[in-house]
Amino acid sequence: MIGLIGRKVGMTRIFTEEGISIPVTVVEVEANRVTQVKSLETDGYNAIQITTGTKKANRVSKPAAGHFAKAGVEAGRGLWEFRLENGEEFAVGAELNVELFNEVKKVDVTGTSKGKGFQGVIKRWNFSTQDMTHGNSLSHRAPGSIGQCQTPGRVFKGKKMAGHMGAERVTTQNLEIVRVDAERNLLLIKGAVPGSIGGNVIVKPAVKA
């Protein structure tokens, strides 16, 4: 399913004709350029590889520069892939823009969540605090028991404990496209999308729409 790569600009709000305020995230989608078309015969699957944005020439490695030059496109800030479904065809060097979503109502947005560093179980996993008084000392925000006794004699994998939070790939599904601004290459998406301002996001038609 083909999508687009954009950059999160921030949040604002727009008003309907009835005066209802709608919170929206603004995603800037510069032209997505096709750098490679992968086929079942040569690569084992059908997909297109795209890039977007710009990158200083002295920041592009020689192999990457050769790859972009072969495709006849300007070097971008990264490379992404989208699997192709039967019947979809794209040419190397072709450009994709926000008009791809003119007929799309709902989208899934993928990004890298904001990093929160090392966090305890209350913030990280929404645990409840223990008693603030009633004889409790130094265990107000502690997780409590993390297992049993000699049997099984270990902590099970996946146990929710304190640790690094955020800075991971997150997808928010079924977000509504409120407006497509082709003139300024903007998508206005209802609600919040993952990541910090300036972060890359992948916008695809919703799989559950």
From Swiss-Prot:
Q: Which PROSITE patterns match?
A: RIBOSOMAL_L3 (PS00474)
Any one Gene Ontology MF annotation carried by this entry is: rRNA binding
Q: Which Gene3D superfamilies match?
A: 3.30.160.810, Translation factors
Which residues are annotated with the PTM N5-methylglutamine?
150
Q: How does it assemble?
A: Part of the 50S ribosomal subunit. Forms a cluster with proteins L14 and L19.
Known function:
One of the primary rRNA binding proteins, it binds directly near the 3'-end of the 23S rRNA, where it nucleates assembly of the 50S subunit.
UniProt name for this protein = Large ribosomal subunit protein uL3
Q: Which organism is it from?
A: Photobacterium profundum (strain SS9)
Keywords, in A-Z order:
Methylation, Ribonucleoprotein, Ribosomal protein, RNA-binding, rRNA-binding
**A GO-annotated cellular component:** cytosolic large ribosomal subunit
Which Pfam family, any one, appears in the UniProt record?
Answer: Ribosomal_L3
- Which domain of life does the UniProt lineage start with? Bacteria
Q: How is it modified after translation?
A: Methylated by PrmB.
InterPro entries reported in the protein's UniProt record: Ribosomal_uL3, Ribosomal_uL3_bac/org-type, Ribosomal_uL3_CS, Transl_B-barrel_sf
Q: Which GO terms describe its biological process?
A: translation
